[in-house]
Swiss-Prot record:
Gene label: gatB
GO molecular function, one term: glutaminyl-tRNA synthase (glutamine-hydrolyzing) activity
Similarity comment: Belongs to the GatB/GatE family. GatB subfamily.
Keywords carried by this UniProt record: ATP-binding, Ligase, Nucleotide-binding, Protein biosynthesis
Protein name listed in UniProt: Aspartyl/glutamyl-tRNA(Asn/Gln) amidotransferase subunit B
Domain of life: Bacteria
A Gene Ontology BP annotation from the UniProt entry: translation
Pfam families: GatB_N, GatB_Yqey
Its biological purpose: Allows the formation of correctly charged Asn-tRNA(Asn) or Gln-tRNA(Gln) through the transamidation of misacylated Asp-tRNA(Asn) or Glu-tRNA(Gln) in organisms which lack either or both of asparaginyl-tRNA or glutaminyl-tRNA synthetases. The reaction takes place in the presence of glutamine and ATP through an activated phospho-Asp-tRNA(Asn) or phospho-Glu-tRNA(Gln).
Subunit structure of this chain's protein: Heterotrimer of A, B and C subunits.
Catalytic activity: L-glutamyl-tRNA(Gln) + L-glutamine + ATP + H2O = L-glutaminyl-tRNA(Gln) + L-glutamate + ADP + phosphate + H(+); L-aspartyl-tRNA(Asn) + L-glutamine + ATP + H2O = L-asparaginyl-tRNA(Asn) + L-glutamate + ADP + phosphate + 2 H(+)
Record-listed E.C. numbers: 6.3.5.-
Enzyme class: ligase
Length: 476
């Protein structure tokens, strides 16, 4: 029997407001435990929440960027549950009137494009963070309590773990472009739960779903779903039954582990939040927020191809993160050739960042520095090979490329007379290579070029070396 996989994702995104959603407490990551709290966050008796307008506008902007319909009338509700990181014993969320509904984003997997629906986007407050220290007790940090969140719930349109990965990458990219969140999973500003079920191919009715938690990276989401897909198929093929349960992904063992079995759907006893009035969002407000949405990744990708002449692959890679795309924009604004700038960012820059596990804002390289280095290559002052030495200094220490070239004596040798001396000397010592080349062995010329580059410590102008080599060989 063949099965079809059905996946839905729930993504929580912390909004990058200065203060929390219902209090004036600072909304900054990295403070000492329980430093960014107030009596409102901690649920003291008699205190009242005040809605943060910036959080509403950030949620509106995200909803619009995700092609959602923004509600004209919305409200907040109490979601009731007991847990140590929830001091009020309820969470202020949105139940039946979310701020955004019926959205979609387009993903691409293996060259095939597909729309993934978004059921809803709603605003809510985050809970605190528990740290299980062992020895029979846990610690709770309420700094995160009251942080504004949007929860984005996808339609069950995702059919493979690869599509889930692509959806998350695209969602993160769009949200980052709007500026409403930095979406840093390592800081908890983007978190994801996944629901997965299997059904026989052709069956309309969904199978029993399993919820996956502890998915700390997009790669873990993909791996967790791949494992769960195989596990459920094995259970069904052996005549077993899938239970509605919550499982966590164990990255060390690369498998999912049972957390708890769900007897039925959770009953949170939602009811309207009595301390907050309903929210009306008029057309003028919506129009203002829509006008503030910047160029999004798909539009920027299209512009890179149509106006800058970049290959579609380059445009896709460059626009995947706003940080990289903005860096590229600034580099070409400083005069760098778009294709050369793209090559360096996708090659040497990305390679260095991946190897060092760093972000662009954590290195010394600037768009101005990269642009000037590229211009030195274009002018023939340095070769691409020498540029890699300059680049290492630029990304680790910064500075002016021209000054680095002068200080290290890296100026490319382009004087024909000087180069010809090296060419003649190498040819005098390598008669066999000359004979090989004349006998049709084209690789011999590569060897001779290599010898000249070695003699000049990589500073010879490659096109000129090739030209002079052919001239001198033809004389012999």
């Amino acid at each position: 029997m063949n099965f079809e996989t059905v996946i839905g994702l729930e993504v929580h995104v912390e909004l990058k407001t200065e203060s929390k959603i219902f209090s004036a407490s600072p909304n900054h990551f990295g403070a000492e435990p329980n430093a960014n709290t107030s009596v409102i966050d901690l649920g003291y008796p008699g205190v009242l929440p005040v809605l943060n307008k910036a959080a509403v506008e950030f949620a509106m902007k995200a909803a619009m960027a995700l092609n959602c319909e923004v509600a004209t009338d919305t409200k907040f509700d109490r979601k009731n549950y007991f847990y140590p990181d929830n001091p009020k014993a309820y969470q202020i969320s949105q139940f039946d009137k979310p701020i955004g509904e019926n959205g979609w984003i387009e993903i691409e997997v293996d060259g095939t494009k597909k729309k993934i629906g978004i059921t809803r986007l709603h605003l809510e407050e985050d809970a605190g963070k528990l740290t299980h220290s062992g020895n029979g007790y846990s610690l709770v940090d309420f700094n995160r309590q009251g942080t504004p969140l949007i929860e984005i719930v996808s339609e069950p349109d995702i059919r493979t773990p690869q599509e889930a990965y692509a959806y998350l990458e695209k969602l993160k990219s769009i949200i980052q472009y709007t500026g409403v969140s930095d979406c840093k999973m390592e800081e908890g500003s983007l978190r994801c739960d996944a629901n997965i079920s299997l059904r026989p191919v052709g069956q309309e009715e969904f199978g029993t779903k399993t919820e996956l938690k502890n998915l700390n990276s997009f790669n873990f989401v993909r791996k967790g779903l791949e494992y769960e897909e195989k596990r459920q198929a094995q259970v069904l093929l052996s005549g077993g039954e899938i239970l509605q349960e919550t499982r966590r992904y164990d990255e060390a063992a690369n498998k999912t582990v049972l957390m708890r079995v769900k007897e039925g759907s959770d009953d949170y006893r939602y009811f309207p939040e009595p301390d907050l009035v309903a929210l009306h969002i008029d057309d003028e407000w919506k129009a203002r927020i829509r006008s503030e949405i910047p160029e999004l990744p798909d539009a920027r990708k299209k512009r890179y191809v149509e106006e800058l002449g970049l290959p579609a692959y380059d445009a896709m890679v460059l626009t995947l993160t706003k940080e990289m795309s903005d860096f590229f924009e600034e580099t070409i604004a400083k005069g760098a050739d778009p294709k050369l700038a793209s090559n360096w960012l996708m090659g040497e820059v990305s390679g260095y960042l991946n190897a060092e596990q760093k972000e662009l804002d954590e290195v010394a390289l600037t768009p101005d520095g990269l642009a000037k280095m590229i211009q030195l290559i274009e002018k023939g002052t340095i070769s691409s090979k020498i540029a890699k030495k300059v680049f290492k200094d630029l990304i680790e220490k910064g500075g002016d490329p021209e000054e680095i070239v002068k200080a290290k004596g890296l100026v490319q040798i382009s004087d024909e007379g000087e180069l010809r001396k090296y060419v003649v000397e190498v040819l005098d010592n390598n008669q066999q290579s000359i004979d090989d080349f004349k006998n049709g062995k084209d690789r011999a010329i590569g060897f001779l070029v290599g010898q000249i580059m070695k003699a000049t410590k990589g500073k010879a102008n490659p096109p000129m070396v090739n030209k002079l080599l052919l001239e001198e060989i033809n004389k012999r």
